[in-house]
């Protein structure tokens, strides 16, 4: 018999695709050759016209096995595996009219493997037992289909979606093959980015009383084929008949592929375009449903509405909505609604007008905008964009899983959220998110709180991975720690922040972005070649290229750099400890080098109190020749380790003498009251003892800290 052989042929072909997706080319070839072997066997005995089409497809597939595959192509097949045991392959298009959903690929005699039914081992009702039902009634009469209802199983969203699809004249029966008595069936559902085949049998949980765990029609009790679609749906949801619910927009998408839109209702107001939506509904271009919020039992009884329940919209006229309850109870089957305060969501599913352009991608939860997946799209006219988070083994996890879509009006990759004008932003814990873009060029940034797989689909325009505006990109990771966290520029410790040398050898356009913890900022200063490797010693506004306010978590700025040297200082307003990341995107190559955080290779410090004096001598000894000494003198009013710009501080100066000869080495006559301290730099030619003379303009009190850094060891005397 050819049918079982074709089922086996398809099984090996699908396995070949799956192995190829995980880069096991050897096994992919083995499976493909096995499918060719089966096909050749069938061709010798059965004159099926489809054999030629299958042969050509399989040979083409074999020839392509050594060609590289994109990650997106691989994920289409990898996403067939929701668990280790399950496999829901994409429907293969052999030619325009022939797919792997054809009944030729279903062995109607051999039963389904027991392993495929594991999720149905437990039932929500102990009285229910699985029984095999032979399905001989394949009636597609809309009258009986409109009378489908839910009973014990809390799947109002599924049943309401089914009813809405019937109202839209979508031939949902065609999702099943074969449409005759069989040991197993294929149901095609749209999930994880593709139309996929789900294999089920007709064993259903039957109750000993008149209650039901499956979808039924109260006007045709022998109509069981809708329950096959329901069983396939429950299979991919992962909990079988222990179903906890979904929403109507999601379910209608899975059943029909129509694009799901969820409109949140507030203050009892329907959207202003509700009449236009209903007009589209009457034209068969959308399906519509509505969902209640949380209602008390008393209020539910008064309103004839169910708490947290989805209804099909049956009619809209003169501000009154007629809804159909998916439950059986005839008295509450159709309800007229004038007050919408108790409804939370409007569900609209749009018939797609265009074939989607799709991209599959893996998501790893990472911080910062520039690390997120980004896609640029050019829309010539209004375009629907659908983001789908894939079903997986962890989809039913109790912890919330949200995803973000941020759309910016630019064609370039985003470094920080403030870099370009934001067009829209959506955050949702729903698995599917639909947005509409106006004509224009946009970059879409996607993020989530958990690792997962996504499919992004565009229904009227192609998109591509976003690229930075300029060709050259540098990324720098750093931190503010206990030694290097100077705070904002109004603090005396500002110069203790991380600092960098930047060199531009030619005129350069530069976009700089920064992400970090806390209120963050960066400042870029003009510098010179002779200060390479030297830290700035004050906040010199005359050399400052940019000024912007501190911002939470991110910062960005754009520059046009002329050839030269620059100093970059990154800071956190409150001197908090944390990490930061810099991204520098430039039109020409630039170099960025971190400046050492200390005065020298060897560092010592000395603290003293002024005690109503105005002079202090500090003796120290160098231990090597040509000692490059850098000295910083800082004043403090108390025990705090920083001063503010508004704090009192005396003007000070410092001079250096040879201790033995008393000859001056460096004399400074000018007093300086810089917030950031007084500095003295000198090269001491020989290892000797020296005197540092520190003076203040007037006698007084307070504390003074002297830091000495040197390329050779220095000893305080």
From Swiss-Prot:
Keywords: Hydrolase, Protease, Thiol protease
A Pfam family matched in the record: Peptidase_C2
EC number of this enzyme: 3.4.22.-
Translocase in keyword set: no
Signal peptide: none
Calpain catalytic domain location: 85-352
GO biological process, one term: symbiont entry into host
Active site: 156, 309, 325
PROSITE patterns: CALPAIN_CAT
Keyword match Manganese: no
Alphabetized GO MF terms: calcium-dependent cysteine-type endopeptidase activity; cysteine-type endopeptidase activity
Highest rank taxon of the organism: Eukaryota
Family from the record: Belongs to the peptidase C2 family. PalB/RIM13 subfamily.
Chain's role: Required for the proteolytic cleavage of the transcription factor RIM101 in response to alkaline ambient pH.
Protein name according to UniProt: Calpain-like protease palB/RIM13
Organism: Candida albicans (strain SC5314 / ATCC MYA-2876)
Gene transcribed to yield this protein: RIM13
């Amino acid at each position: 018999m050819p049918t079982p052989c074709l089922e086996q042929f398809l099984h090996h072909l699908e396995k070949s695709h799956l192995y190829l997706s995980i880069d096991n080319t050897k096994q992919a070839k083995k499976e493909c050759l096995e499918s060719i072997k089966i096909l050749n066997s069938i061709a010798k005995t059965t004159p099926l016209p489809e054999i030629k089409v299958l042969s050509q497809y399989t040979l083409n597939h074999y020839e392509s096995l050594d060609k590289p595959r994109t990650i997106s192509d691989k994920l289409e097949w990898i996403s067939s595996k929701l668990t280790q045991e399950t496999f829901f392959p994409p429907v293969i298009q052999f030619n325009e009219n022939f797919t792997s959903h054809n009944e030729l690929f279903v062995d109607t005699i051999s039963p389904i493997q027991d392993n495929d039914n594991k999720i149905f081992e437990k039932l929500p009702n102990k009285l229910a037992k699985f029984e095999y039902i032979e399905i001989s009634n394949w009636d597609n009469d809309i009258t009986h289909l409109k009378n489908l209802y839910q009973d014990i199983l809390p799947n109002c969203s599924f049943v309401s979606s089914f009813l809405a699809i019937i109202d839209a004249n979508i031939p949902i029966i065609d999702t099943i093959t074969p449409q005759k008595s069989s040991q197993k069936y294929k149901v095609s559902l749209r999930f994880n980015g593709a139309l996929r085949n789900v294999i089920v049998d007709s064993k259903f949980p039957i109750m000993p009383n008149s209650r039901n765990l499956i979808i039924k029609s109260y006007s045709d009790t022998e109509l069981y084929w809708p329950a096959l679609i329901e069983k396939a749906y429950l299979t991919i949801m992962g909990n079988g008949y222990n179903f906890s619910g979904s929403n109507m927009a999601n379910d209608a998408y899975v059943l029909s592929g129509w694009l799901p839109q969820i409109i949140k209702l507030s203050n009892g107001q329907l959207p202003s375009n509700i009449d236009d939506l209903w007009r589209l509904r009457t034209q068969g271009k959308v399906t519509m449903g509505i969902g209640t919020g949380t209602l008390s039992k008393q209020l539910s009884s008064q309103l004839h509405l169910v708490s947290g329940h989805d209804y099909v919209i049956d009619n809209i006229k003169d501000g009154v909505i007629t809804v159909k309850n998916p439950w059986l109870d005839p008295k509450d089957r159709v309800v007229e609604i004038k007050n919408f305060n108790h409804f939370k969501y409007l569900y609209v599913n749009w018939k797609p007008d265009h074939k989607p352009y799709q991209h599959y991608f893996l998501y790893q939860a990472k911080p910062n905008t520039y690390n997120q997946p980004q896609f640029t799209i050019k829309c010539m006219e209004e375009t629907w964009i659908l983001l789908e988070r894939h079903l997986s083994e962890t989809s039913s996890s109790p912890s919330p899983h949200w995803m973000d879509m941020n759309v910016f009006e630019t064609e370039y990759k985003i470094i920080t959220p403030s870099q370009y004008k934001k067009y829209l932003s959506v955050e949702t814990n729903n698995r599917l998110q639909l947005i509409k873009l106006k004509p224009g060029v946009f970059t879409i940034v996607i993020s989530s709180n958990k690792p997962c797989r996504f499919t992004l689909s565009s229904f009227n325009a192609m998109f591509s991975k976003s690229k930075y505006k300029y060709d050259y990109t540098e990324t720098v990771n750093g931190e503010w720690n206990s030694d290097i966290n100077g705070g904002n520029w109004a603090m005396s410790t500002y110069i203790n922040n991380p600092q960098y040398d930047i060199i531009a050898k030619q005129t350069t356009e530069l976009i700089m972005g920064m992400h970090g913890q806390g209120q963050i900022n960066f400042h870029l200063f003009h510098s010179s070649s002779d200060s390479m490797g030297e830290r700035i010693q004050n906040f010199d506004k005359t050399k400052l290229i940019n000024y912007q306010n501190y911002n939470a978590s991110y910062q960005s700025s754009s520059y046009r750099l002329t050839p030269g040297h620059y100093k970059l200082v990154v800071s956190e307003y409150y001197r908090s400890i944390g990490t930061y990341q810099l991204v520098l995107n430039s039109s020409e190559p630039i170099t960025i080098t971190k400046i050492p955080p200390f005065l020298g290779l060897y560092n010592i410090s000395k603290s003293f109190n002024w005690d109503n004096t105005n002079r202090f001598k500090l003796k120290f000894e160098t231990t090597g020749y040509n000692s490059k000494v850098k000295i910083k003198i800082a004043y403090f009013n108390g025990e705090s380790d920083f001063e503010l710009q508004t704090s009192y501080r005396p003007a000070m100066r410092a001079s250096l003498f040879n201790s033995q000869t008393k000859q001056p080495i460096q004399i400074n006559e000018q007093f300086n009251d810089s917030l950031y301290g007084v500095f003295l730099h000198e090269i001491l030619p020989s290892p000797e003892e020296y005197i540092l003379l520190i003076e203040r303009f007037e006698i007084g009190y307070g504390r003074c800290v002297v830091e000495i850094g040197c390329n050779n060891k220095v000893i305080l005397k």
